[in-house]
From Swiss-Prot:
One of its GO terms (biological process) is mRNA 5'-splice site recognition. Belongs to the PRP39 family. This is Pre-mRNA-processing factor 39. Gene3D superfamilies: Tetratricopeptide repeat domain. The keyword Nucleotidyltransferase does not apply. The gene is PRP39. InterPro entries: HAT (IPR003107), TPR-like_helical_dom_sf (IPR011990). SUPFAM superfamilies: TPR-like (SSF48452). It is found in: Nucleus. Function prior to stable branch point recognition by the U1 snRNP particle to facilitate or stabilize the U1 snRNP/5'-splice site interaction. Has a direct role in the assembly or function of a catalytically active spliceosome. It comes from Saccharomyces cerevisiae (strain ATCC 204508 / S288c). Its main location: nucleus. It comes from the Eukaryota. The lineage of its organism: Eukaryota, Fungi, Dikarya, Ascomycota, Saccharomycotina. One of its GO terms (cellular component) is U2-type prespliceosome.
Amino acid sequence: MPDETNFTIEDIEPRPDALRGLDTQFLQDNTALVQAYRGLDWSDISSLTQMVDVIEQTVVKYGNPNDSIKLALETILWQILRKYPLLFGFWKRFATIEYQLFGLKKSIAVLATSVKWFPTSLELWCDYLNVLCVNNPNETDFIRNNFEIAKDLIGKQFLSHPFWDKFIEFEVGQKNWHNVQRIYEYIIEVPLHQYARFFTSYKKFLNEKNLKTTRNIDIVLRKTQTTVNEIWQFESKIKQPFFNLGQVLNDDLENWSRYLKFVTDPSKSLDKEFVMSVFDRCLIPCLYHENTWMMYIKWLTKKNISDEVVVDIYQKANTFLPLDFKTLRYDFLRFLKRKYRSNNTLFNNIFNETVSRYLKIWPNDILLMTEYLCMLKRHSFKNSLDQSPKEILEKQTSFTKILETSITNYINNQIDAKVHLQTLINDKNLSIVVVELIKTTWLVLKNNMQTRKYFNLYQKNILIKNSVPFWLTYYKFEKSNVNFTKLNKFIRELGVEIYLPTTVMNDILTDYKTFYLTHSNIVTYESSIIDSNTFDPILYPELKMSNPKYDPVLNTTANVDWHKKTEWKEAGHIGITTERPQISNSIIECNSGTLIQKPISLPNFRNLEKINQVKINDLYTEEFLKEGK
């Protein structure tokens, strides 16, 4: 157990099984605790509440349990609150339980942790500050510092009058009249529910202390009163201001939406801190609503709020939003790239940490590796116009070496944990790193020979063999070299040895037909059909559309005895076979190129005797349908 004097709730061991290590007899005697924990439904507030109820009952039952039991109970509560830190009622109950188990210091430590994990909770701040004032009255500077922190976090909330009452009470107790006046001067501009009471108290305070103010507070009163009257139409309709695991009521969502549109209206010219306070309050019940987070970030960006604040909001959204919300998370990456120039090191580090976190969530998302490689090149291998060509070449060569080493180490299962790129590569995004290596070698270093070596090397790897980016890059490379031999081979292998999505293959086939007609000539065409009697670079792509496994060689071989197949004889009528007369040496399906080499022979026929065969007795027509002959 950690030392009580330096205790914070984060010191509790984050083990997955809180009941591990407990005495068997204790577990048998407390089946309610075991069942509640083992059957805990993390998505049901009733189940979580029942768990805390059982913990409280256990504390009452044992009074002063041993350290193992205390740790187990603390761990369960910490698991709940780490997952749902906005359950302010659970923090209060946790503080009470800690007081019963350990005493005042740990109880205060829990409250201190609560305002760290839920900094916009008015209730938790009031509880924490009240406990500090009552139990640590001599720590004036520490208490005042916490009041100032709370003022910035919850002081602009519409119902924050209990906090301001406590703050004024504290400074009055210290007889610091200057600070009392400073607080009143701040409050009278804040649209609070009980604004009028504070104006009255301020005037009384000025008269009693014979103090002057530098402005007409009646004018300030009218302005504040107007703002309060305008926002009351929204404040009065808020039914659920707290966080819950259930869905937010539609009426509340619509009311919050109208409220946010009102406070962000430029024509209202409301105080920025007040608008931020409204957003913070809205995001308590609407924690899982991506649109609200996006609206908040958009407003912060428009108002030129510091990048640190915007990053903090993005990171909070990353923490709380369900994992299937990608829009905001990818928007965060774009924001970091936009702001990169303002602080290269800071934003690069945040970018790397964010990509690492996203790849753990979505390991199959190859776009993340693409974004990471762009930032890696921009940060560690950037070029500028004032650099010499030699310096630029050296940097780009170094970049390719880093890529090649990372690829080789991953394939050989020799990952270097010190190289961040190598820790991010997985089976799905390996091809993206390979493609980046190939593109840099081909387009930047202009080394076609090495590029072809990379293609030949990596196309054999099972993790890359069916990669769309890899083969599209290969296709573009061969097109740039107008290498019809390689291209024809590639087109033939599509769907046979190279398996890509049908839509991708169709796009390639369509593009290749156009490319061939544009860049080829009659000599090239004749040589290709003579070299391969079964491959026509103009007709073949058309025949292969939406039929990836089409192979003229296989089809030619199969056509030798095609007339003997049951499918042909049945002609769609299963069980009824006919042998129709037909030409056995038809020229329709022959390669037209062979017709000029020898004269066309006369047609030969098979099954001619079938012309005069006896008509089948159609019992179905005659007897069932009752039709005459």
